[in-house]
Amino acid sequence: DLASIGGNEILHTAARGESITVIFVNNGLFGMTGGQMAPTTLMGQRTATSPDGRINFMGQPMKMAELMAGLDGPVYVERVALFNPKQRNRAKKAIHKALQIQTEGRGFAFVEVLAECPTHLKLSPEETEKWVEEKMLPVFPLGVKKAETREPWWNVPKPTFEKERVLKEI
């Protein structure tokens, strides 16, 4: 999971402004390994490892888009959702923009996608779409969190290793 065991790597990759696009699917739990609590699990949300629901002792849900936007490295950060056709079209546009940034060589782009998990929520697909809209949006508001047009950070003069200059500097 990007927000837990991948947290160190994603934060440092973003801070460096690496030229990649990251698409983070946030369904509020670890869906592929049994429905355990994840860093993005909502307060009160029941999971296989929090059967009584997430409580304060377990920490608040991590807002990854806001964390990424707070770093200097990323040039584009947006949170989108998939709960209706309008939102799916917005998600498509955000992903397209993030990939376009790569073709322009501008650096790190991050798109967080709020998604449904009917299996572990034990709801129908339609009910999970409503669940995302009603439960996740208040905690994870949609929208662009960062959009910069600056030049890539690596467009800086190359370091020199001229022996005389290095010796003079030290």
Predicted segments, located by residue:
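Thiamine diphosphate
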Residues: 1-31, 93-97
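A short secondary-structure junction signal
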Residues: 6-8, 33-35, 79-80, 89-93, ...
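Short, solvent-exposed amphipathic alpha-helical segments in soluble enzyme
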Residues: 10-12, 38-39, 93-97, 126-134
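Structural motif
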Residues: 19-23, 29, 66, 74-78, ...
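Glycine-rich beta-alpha junction loops
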Residues: 27-29, 83-84, 113-120
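Conserved thiamine diphosphate
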Residues: 38-104
